[in-house]
Curated annotation (Swiss-Prot):
Coiled coil: none annotated. It is a single-pass membrane protein. PSII is composed of 1 copy each of membrane proteins PsbA, PsbB, PsbC, PsbD, PsbE, PsbF, PsbH, PsbI, PsbJ, PsbK, PsbL, PsbM, PsbT, PsbX, PsbY, PsbZ, Psb30/Ycf12, peripheral proteins PsbO, CyanoQ (PsbQ), PsbU, PsbV and a large number of cofactors. It forms dimeric complexes. Keywords: Membrane, Photosynthesis, Photosystem II, Thylakoid, Transmembrane, Transmembrane helix. GO terms for biological process: photosynthesis; protein stabilization. Disulfide bonds: none annotated. SUPFAM superfamilies: Photosystem II 10 kDa phosphoprotein PsbH (SSF161025). One of its GO terms (molecular function) is phosphate ion binding. It comes from Gloeothece citriformis (strain PCC 7424) (Cyanothece sp. (strain PCC 7424)). Belongs to the PsbH family. This is Photosystem II reaction center protein H.
């Protein structure tokens, strides 16, 4: 038998929804939208780093970060 601890008593409400699944797709669509937005964000950062996306007055150089 598991021993009761004060930490377990505090964390028990967080585990009260264990095993319950929302019917249907739930928030899967919303998660997909956020994944797409995060992908676009990473793509823009990569293009700035590779100088594929040109921004006026913005130099991509490691030495400029130290100034």
């Amino acid at each position: 038998m598991a021993q009761r601890t004060w930490l377990g008593d505090i964390l028990r409400p967080l585990n009260s929804e264990y095993g319950k699944v929302a019917p249907g797709w739930g928030t899967t669509g919303l998660m997909g939208v956020f994944m797409l937005l995060f992908f676009v964000f990473l793509l823009i950062i990569l293009q700035i780093y590779n100088s594929s996306l040109l921004l006026e007055g913005f130099k991509v150089d490691w030495r400029s970060l130290g100034q």
